[in-house]
Structures are given as structure tokens and as C-alpha cells.
Amino acid sequence: MSSMEKNVLIRNALIANYNNYAQGIDTKDWSMVRDCFADDVFIDYGALSASTGDPALPREADDWVKHLQSVINGFDITQHMITNHRFCISSTAVSCRAYLSADHVIFANTEVPVVADEDVITVVGEYNNHYSEIDGEWKICKSELVVHWSHGNAELFVEATERALAQLKSQK
């Protein structure tokens, strides 16, 4: 296989990884999200991950996915769109930058899925993921998110976390 063919396969695998991550979050398929990561991962999402540990230290991917669940499960619906993939593929490293636009919604009335300004927080930014090939699959070993801006009701993250915690307690 030529290096160009190999690079195309890697690019396709990285895009699939981003797509699986977004789909997993939006459908709350946490095993799909977990499959996107190596067992140990460096996470730096700025303020969004600050409470989960030092971004310079690796953490267990299982713990990171549990943290995502503790927020996302409290939203009625999310939509993560990841686009404009830019690849860096060399003999020693594989990474990909991509734009993010993510809507996070708590409906005032779930029977009428109309979103008012106070029902949504949109986060716009850029991922920079670094990958390792593990058992023939490309997995995220380092993920950075730089938030460029957000629009909407930022308090929804607090409300979603409280709702997710209440859901967890009611299941016990």
C-alpha cells in the first residue's frame, strides 16, 4: 500500500472516530463514546474539564466518559456537529483538528419540542485530537477543546448536571 493510500485510510478512520464520538454523545450511547478513546487519555477542555483533573496528567477514559455522562444525561437532546477536519499525519504522530458546534437543550415542555433562547446553550470551538493506533483502530489518546464562544443559557450546564444526578439517584 502506498503512503498516500495509507493516509487516506487514516483520514477516513479519524473522521469516523469524530462521527462516532458525536453520535455517541447525541444518542447517549456511552459505549460508543468510550470506544473512541485509548484506555488512558489526556483531556483539556479548558473550564469544561477543569474539575476533572490536571490536563497534563493522563486519566482513565472510563472516568472521562462517566464525567461526560454526568452532564450530557441531564439534557433532553444534544446535537454535536464536527466539521472541517485538518489532518497532520507523519511517521511519528497522527492528529486532527476539527470545528465543533454543539447545541445542548432542556425543553420547557418535552411534548412540544420548540426551543426558546433560555432552553439552549450552543458551544462553538475547535477540537485538536491526537491518536494512537491500538489493535488496528485509531483511538484518541489526547483531546483538547478550545471554546471560541457560546451562545444561550449557560446555566443549563448546571441544571443538566443536577438533572443527571437526580436521574442516577432515582435508578438506585
Description of each model-found segment:
Residues 1-39:
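Short, low-complexity N-terminal intrinsically disordered segments enriched in polar/charged residues
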Residues 73-84, 88-172:
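A beta-strand edge to alpha-helix "cap/lid" segment located at domain peripheries
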Residues 6, 11, 62-65, 97, ...:
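Generic N-terminal initiation segments characterized by hydrophobic and/or small/turn-forming residues
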